Amino acid sequence: MSNSHPLRPFTAVGEIDHVHILSEHIGALLIGEEYGDVTFVVEKKRFPAHRVILAARCQYFRALLYGGMRESQPEAEIPLEDTTAEAFTMLLKYIYTGRATLTDEKEEVLLDFLSLAHKYGFPELEDSTSEYLCTILNIQNVCMTFDVASLYSLPKLTCMCCMFMDRNAQEVLSSEGFLSLSKTALLNIVLRDSFAAPEKDIFLALLNWCKHNSNENHAEIMQAVRLPLMSLTELLNVVRPSGLLSPDAILDAIKVRSESRDMDLNYRGMLIPEENIATMKYGAQVVKGELKSALLDGDTQNYDLDHGFSRHPIDDDCRSGIEIKLGQPSIINHIRILLWDRDSRSYSYFIEVSMDELDWIRVIDHSQYLCRSWQKLYFPARVCRYIRIVGTHNTVNKIFHIVAFECMFTNKTFTLEKGLIVPMENVATIADCASVIEGVSRSRNALLNGDTKNYDWDSSYTCHQLGSGAIVVQLAQPYMIGSIRLLLWDCDDRSYSYYVEVSTNQQQWTMVADRTKVSCKSWQSVTFERRPASFIRIVGTHNTANEVFHCVHFECPEQQSAQKDSSDEPGTGGASAAGQQLDPHALQAPSGSSLPSSPGSNSRSPNRQHQ
């Protein structure tokens, strides 16, 4: 026996879902004029409809058809002047069925349809139509799409249009759609730093727009041109004959160009958010430095003493360096570099950017700090074409080594103070390349692994002998730090005393917490005036149980959301359970182990000058 019904969506037993049938039956009312009690007239075409359905689906029609106005009269005809018959047909189908087919429609119809969705208050339809328009952007339709998206304040569609135009700026300038842009939309486009076309091309396109829009204020439009970015020849032979800019404006531009630093000019640059542009895909290349090919190959795993890095000799006048040329001027605010880290060495360095290789602006200065492994660097956004990394110090030899380099623009929020990041999240983690460089533990970085529950009498802590040594944590790079948090070993009732110091170079130390005369247990929160720090040293001065200072966990800055009550689970062993089996003094030298005097004593320390 045949079944005339289409396949139905699966529903759980006890649930009936026939929404698709309801949609079909209500949609069938559009085919004829049965039961219709209102008619819309669009482009001389009549559209019979049903008041109750329109009112149920749309607040606008509810007010129009039941608000006591002329349109609420029985059998009323309502003319609509601000749309097309094609777009209104699509809207009625959506109102009656919840469905709309976009793929077969022209861009002009889709934009009219989007306008109706906005006017009549269908936010879900507005979003879905915007998402589809994002997928079909091209040179011919992007300008009119941007105009509509700007008019109706559609952020996602506006953003996608801007990104498309930024990446195709010169083609957009020469398109027919550019001439039909509204003045507001036009200025929103060309005032963007990321609209990276040559300034001469922008000027000529605006000149053409002014000819096609003679009623607009041309002076306001021409103010969007960045005259100092144009050459003297262009100013005299292209701008001056147009007559749209005064001689004084041209002379001022020449003056700014001749008297300003090159990097102070308001350059335009390509903007590709959240994507590394220091790649061959985007035309980047290493133009200075030794072993150039390794730096941008994307391999951050396969490197050792002899290969997998770029380098330059460290000299006193800082003339050497590793220089990257980007494929085109670009806007960046984030750089990541991987310093060679197969041993415990540290480096110092600075980074500069330029547009012409003559005028350099320093964006990162870590020349007075010791740094290791991955460097995650942030700075105010800059347009640049060249990036230079200059090593100033290596704790092992006179060679500066970089394994990988990345740069991009990121929308991630960050705070800088004195040129250093003020971290919001814990940066004393293994993932952030922090390490314990002094202290005794079964596992070198147990202090930083984030485990604050699984510790006992015999493992998962870091310690040092009172009166000798300390526990020292090295962060991968300097940060502005104003708080730290410790978990002292608390499987019994013992208490500790200690103090904390910070440093940027392991030579000069500043005490930030003095708890030598305080009995301290379990979680310790330490806050102090924010200051630069690459190293944190924790020195125990007293333990009521023995002559060893034990710490289970360290973080900086303090993560308040992770605060643990010291009365809850003082360790997996617990004082009572573990105390029945082990002597607390065993913490000085855990049974069955032979702990090194420092975690790094077994690591290689190559001193090969040719590395």
From Swiss-Prot:
Compositional bias segments (type: Low complexity): 586-611
Region span, Disordered: 560-611
Residues of the BACK domain: 142-240
Stored SUPFAM superfamilies: Galactose-binding domain-like, POZ domain
Occurrences of domain BTB (ranges): 36-104
GO BP terms: adult locomotory behavior; circadian behavior; modulation of chemical synaptic transmission
PROSITE patterns according to UniProt: BTB
GO cellular component term, pick one: cytoplasm
Record-given protein name: BTB/POZ domain-containing protein 9
